């Protein structure tokens, strides 16, 4: 299996993260699943729900590069799902949306590069296409950072 004997870190602890945790822990060969999220209550509930020694709940914020770097050290794969996701919240608090969805995502990318993770998967949204909201715009910028610069006239990889 793809994740055999590997350690995976998931940022965020929303609906997608819960589904990923369920799937990953179903593989007996998974070494460790780390969940890095700032929601203390959700972290506690998740640890009780799964009650699996391979699950490591880490309270932290992707906007804090040092804490994130510490959490990522030693993992093989990173699944980045941490974000402010409510359109109305991002509209009312654009600075927070930028700090989390753009700067925080950049921190995830930089920490993943500096610790030589095998693969980083960044989750986005359909709202980033022709973005008309602050949320959509921040996710579009996250996508651009993930793709990185490319020579003019070249298409991004498939």
Say what each PLM segment does.
Residues 56-77:
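Conserved Rossmann-fold cofactor-binding substructure of NAD(P)-dependent oxidoreductases
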Residues 45-53:
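Short, conserved SAM-binding/catalytic segment
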Residues 77-80, 84-143, 148, 157:
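Conserved Rossmann-fold NAD(P)-dependent oxidoreductase catalytic core, especially the SDR/UDP-sugar
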Residues 37, 58-59, 99:
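Conserved residues in the N-terminal Rossmann fold of short-chain dehydrogenase/reductase
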Residues 40-41:
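Helix N-cap at the beta1-alpha1 junction of Rossmann-like dinucleotide-binding domains, i.e.
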Residues 9-12:
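Conserved N-terminal Rossmann-fold NAD(P)-binding element of oxidoreductases
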Residues 25-32, 116:
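Conserved S-adenosyl-L-methionine
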Residues 16-17:
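Hydrophobic/small residue at the entry helix of a nucleotide-binding pocket
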